[in-house]
Amino acid sequence: MKKILALILVVTTMMTVAGCSGTTNDTSATSDDVKVWRFCHEESVGSVQDQFAMKFKELVEEKSDGKIRVDVYPVGQLADGVGAIELLRYNAVNFAINNPATVATIIPENQLLMLHYVFSDDMEVNRKALNEGNATKELDRLYTEKDMIPLNWFQEGFQVVTSNFPIYTPEDMNGFKIRVMASPLLIAAYSAYGCNPTPVPYMETYSNLQLNMIDGQVNPVFAIEEMKFYEVQEYLNFLNHEVFIGTFCTNPEFWESLTEEEKTMVMEIQEELDQYVFDMQNQYSQERLEKILANKPSIELIEYTDEERAAFQEKAQAGYDYYLGLTGEEGQKLLNMLQEDIAAAEKEVNQDI
C-alpha cells in the first residue's frame, strides 16, 4: 500500500514538474539544449537548506556554462517530509536535502544523528567527524541500499528550545507540551525530560503556539527567527543538546546517467559548499539571534553551565536506550563509530589550536 501511495505521489509530482519546466525527463534537454536538474529541500525560502540549494544552482549553472539548469523546490512545493524522500528515491527529483527524522522512517539507524548530547559543543569537531568519520560512511551504505547517495553531511546549528517559562532543570519540563518532528526517538528523548512531545507539521507550528495548542518547540535559531516562533514565545533555552543535521543526496539512477565531467563538477561543487554552508550557518545563527533580540528585546536567553547540562544528559540516556533497542547490534556499532569519530576529531582540532 505504501509503495502504491508513493508511486501516486511520484506520478502527480512528475505531472506538476512537467507543467513547470516543460519536461518530465530527468536530464532531458529543453528547446535550447539545456539539461534540467531538480533539487528539493525541506525548508522555506531563505533558510540554510535553501541557501545551500541556491548556491548549488548558481555554481552548476556557472560551471556548465549554462548548459545545465537547476530548478529548486522549497518545502511544500512538491512534497513535505517523507514524500520528498520518495520523490528522490523514485528519481522524480535528482537532488534533495533530508533531515534524520524523515530518513529514519526507512533507515531507523539514521536516528543516531538525533541522539541528545552525542555531538561536541565545537562545530568544527562535528564537521570533521561528519566529513571524515566512519559512522557517516556506514550510513552512506545504508542510504545507498534505499536508493539515495549522500554527497554531503552538514550542520544547521544547535537546536534551541523555546518556551513561555524558564527551563533550568529537567523538572521544569514536566508536562511541557513541546512540538517535535514525528520521530519515535525524539518522543522518547523528550518524554524522559518529563515533556509531552507532540509532533506538529513544521508549517503549522506557529499557529499551534499562538493558539496554545502546544507550549513550545525546538529548532535552530535561524528557523525560530525565520518562522517568527519567537513572537509567541518568551524564552530561548540553549541546552546544546542536539545538532540539526542536513544530508545532501542524489538518486543512484540519475547519478549513473551523468557524464564523468558532470560527476566531477558536482563533487567539486559539494566540496565548495561544505565550507560555504559551515560559514553560512554560523553567520545565520548569530545574525538571526541579533534580529530576534532587536525585534523582541523582552525575550530572555537561558544558557547552562556544564553542571546544569549534566542533569539533562543523564535523562537523555533514555533516548539511547530506545535507539539501541530499535536498531540492535547495527545501532550499537554506529554509535560506537560516531563516538570514536568525535573523540578523534576533538583531539585533532585541539592539536591545531
Predicted regions mapped to residue ranges:
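N-terminal secretory/targeting leader peptides
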Residues: 21-125, 141-145, 149-353
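Positively charged n-region of N-terminal signal peptides that target proteins for export
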Residues: 1-4
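C-terminal motif of bacterial Sec signal peptides marking the signal peptidase cleavage site
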Residues: 15-19
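Repetitive helical segments and hydrophobic/amphipathic motifs
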Residues: 11-12
